[in-house]
Amino acid sequence: MSTHFDIVIVGSGAGGASLAQRLAPTGKSILILERGEHLPREAENWSPRAVFIEHRYRTTDRWYDKNGHPFTPNSYYWVGGNTTFYGAALMRLRGRDFQEVQHAGGVSPAWPISLAALAPYYDEAERLWQVHGQRGEDPTENGDEPPYAYPAVSHDPAIAELKGHWQNAGWRPFSLPLGVKLDEAHPFTSTCIKCKTCGGYPCLLRAKCDARTLAVEPLLDVPNVTLLPGRKAVRLETDPSGKTITTVVCQTAQGEERWTGDIVVVAAGAANTAALLLASASPTHPSGLANSSDQVGRNYMFHTLTAVVSLSARRIDVTFPKTLAVNDFYFGDPRGGFDKPMGHIQLLEYMSGQTLEGQISDWLPPALVPGALAGAVAERLLSMLVISEDLPLAENRIHLGPDGRINLDYTHNNLEGHERLVNTLCASLNGFVAESHAISQHRLELHSLLPLYGTAHQLGTVRFGADPKSSVLDPWCKAHDLDNLYVVDTSFFVSAAAVNPTLTTVANAMRVGDHLIERMKG
């Protein structure tokens, strides 16, 4: 095999795989380097114990927080990346998310592109990723989005009751857009069966729309695309001028490998992409590759999250509860009294007894929790997630220790709107459940985060912008400092917004792909 390719992509997650898929029809030779292996298809894929208690598929890497405490990030290094384990919520950023927005805790900066630049790619990504939803329900929609190609996923009985409860309170709950291969009109032939093992699990049926099933696997037989798993990129080398990347150096079980490409794209995840650039410091890039702005690794975001766990006196009739969301408070409280953004509410996945044990394992070892008790509690739980925007701060950053380890310095910020929304949600559940408890990420140490979420929505670190002094990438996601380096994972985000970033990552990779196609024509 030749060691030179037209395009070398580091990472096979939503960004890297979507870019490869976009570029494959050009006939250009494409190499995808993935640190993980192919995920085994096995019974444990759907085992709550294996997934949440034994952490069978999660990385064993250790990162270190600002106090030097080690913790295991909620990351999965497999072909297809983290989307193999995500909850399949696929939402567009709102139009105002691309603009400068004043929050209670500071300013969320404007993006160098508008919603209009991504809109056609959002349309395409929603079709490709088979997003099920219903236009016209979400009060924050622009109103010009095309109808979803797939109908909204139906609500379980208890979720339908909750929807009515909120509507009676004047709220406007809507169907959460989900990427699943579901055909409810033909349940006996539908790939998706609306099971209890979706979010947090790999799908044994290949029914979840993720990078592995929709982007990577269709490329495996494409002759000009080569996927090499088990290759961790550890350094990028440049020519003597420092303007062009010449080599991607990988660490494998067999030793070091070196690959060259005319264009190099990094899509290793916000933390690992920043770490790779910092580890690639050289005489021409003494502070790290593409880091003349001193912004590589900075502005790390991962949303402010609170799980609201509600306990009912009666058994709650749910199998697939994650179908409902609320955006009434996204940009402020419609009741008045607070005109700053608060965030987004969505129902969470079904939580079995062993899932519950895994979620509390940082505080109470599973061996001390009787299985029957955990199961009985889980049958009466209804869980929701409040997502709010954290702001990009220079001091919230990824940096490397002397031994190359990843250090994550992070201080929670912009909490007022989030806490108001949590309190509003808990109050709204009065009369529907017996009691509600908020488990807030920002009240925990970084090494004791909710395991299901943790660092799952990592963003920023290599943000794009028009000014090389304050950004790492240009508006096409090419590094300001280099001629042939692009980044297409969530590193490029300027702000976090308050929704899952996957759909935006896919749409942007398509946009950058079209730009690269035009570049290669020249």
Language-model regions, residue ranges each:
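Extreme N-terminal leader/targeting segments of oxidoreductases
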Residues: 1-7, 25-26, 518-522
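FAD cofactor-binding and catalytic pocket of flavoenzymes
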Residues: 67-74, 92, 111-115, 293-412, ...
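Glycine-rich loop(s) and the adjacent beta-strand/alpha-helix scaffold that form part
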Residues: 25, 29, 36-41, 46, ...
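Redox-cofactor-proximal catalytic regions of oxidoreductases
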Residues: 51-139, 332, 387-389, 394
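Conserved redox-cofactor binding core of oxidoreductases
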Residues: 102-233, 449, 454
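A conserved FAD-binding loop/helix module that cradles the flavin
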Residues: 495-513
